[in-house]
Amino acid sequence: MAAATMALSSPVMARAAPSTSSALFGEARITMRKTAAKPKPAASSGSPWYGADRVLYLGPLSGEPPSYLTGEFPGDYGWDTAGLSADPETFAKNRELEVIHSRWAMLGALGCVFPELLARNGVKFGEAVWFKAGSQIFSEGGLDYLGNPSLIHAQSILAIWAVQVVLMGAVEGYRIAGGPLGEVVDPLYPGGAFDPLGLADDPEAFAELKVKEIKNGRLAMFSMFGFFVQAIVTGKGPLENLADHLADPVNNNAWAYATNFVPGK
């Protein structure tokens, strides 16, 4: 169950995207922006990821994509069996949710794997398995970040929740509102202070980065789902599960665990 493959770059089948404008992100958001500069095109002509001649979900074996999937947005591979992209307003909302969750999943997958990787290479900083580290907040002694009580010592899950709501609510509000002056046109890719390295300065490179982001984000969401299932079924971290599988793939695989798993035991 080696789910930590978020760095792959092969195309992933995904919900595709209809043509829509930034106004579909909600009337309330548009009124919060004081300026509305024309957004840059998604990509130049000739890109393999955009337009009518883009890469499709089954390559040359793909059927004709629905008429509303024009290849305007990153991650559109012409596949929408359930018709989730048929309604432009519904699609605009789902597209935003997918991008935001993709970003959180990429951060989460890294946070699940990296501490365990360090621990397996001799770095000592307390509990390395992601779900076991988090559960320490419910112990009598509380949780020490990085195993060091002099850094951050947390004892209340409610306090952590409140801090998260305030901090993340402020950042999300800033993003959705278009910055302090409401000058950002696209809340999904706000740029400015959210792009200190200037990765979006080149339109063609930026269009390709959008594709890489959504592809890796979709893989990361599957990875996080796999990490949760592994934690419930095996009680081990993702790297330990990977090591067990490589050592004995016949007895340590998804099918073997699924046929022997008994909830609560």
From Swiss-Prot:
Binding annotation for chlorophyll b 1: Y57
A Gene Ontology molecular function term of the record: metal ion binding
Residues that coordinate or bind chlorophyll a 1: W79, S85, E98, R218
TM region positions: 99-119, 151-171, 180-200, 219-239
Sites of N2-acetylarginine modification: R33
List of residues binding chlorophyll b 2: R103, I152, L181
Gene Ontology process terms (BP): photosynthesis; photosynthesis, light harvesting in photosystem I; response to light stimulus
Record note on cofactor: Binds at least 14 chlorophylls (8 Chl-a and 6 Chl-b) and carotenoids such as lutein and neoxanthin.
Binding residues for chlorophyll a 4: N216
Residues at which chlorophyll b 3 binds: S156, E172
Post-translational modifications reported in the UniProt record: Photoregulated by reversible phosphorylation of its threonine residues.
Localization per Swiss-Prot or TrEMBL: Plastid, Chloroplast thylakoid membrane
Membrane topology: Multi-pass membrane protein
Transit peptide: 1-32
Modified sites of kind Phosphothreonine: T35
Presence of the UniProt keyword Transmembrane in the record: yes
Binding annotation for chlorophyll a 5: K212, Q230
Binding site for chlorophyll b 5: Q164, F261
Subunit structure: The LHC complex consists of chlorophyll a-b binding proteins.
Domain notes: The N-terminus of the protein extends into the stroma where it is involved with adhesion of granal membranes and post-translational modifications; both are believed to mediate the distribution of excitation energy between photosystems I and II.
Physiological role: The light-harvesting complex (LHC) functions as a light receptor, it captures and delivers excitation energy to photosystems with which it is closely associated.
PANTHER family: CHLOROPHYLL A/B BINDING PROTEIN
Protein name (Swiss-Prot/TrEMBL): Chlorophyll a-b binding protein 1, chloroplastic
Source organism of this protein record: Oryza sativa subsp. japonica
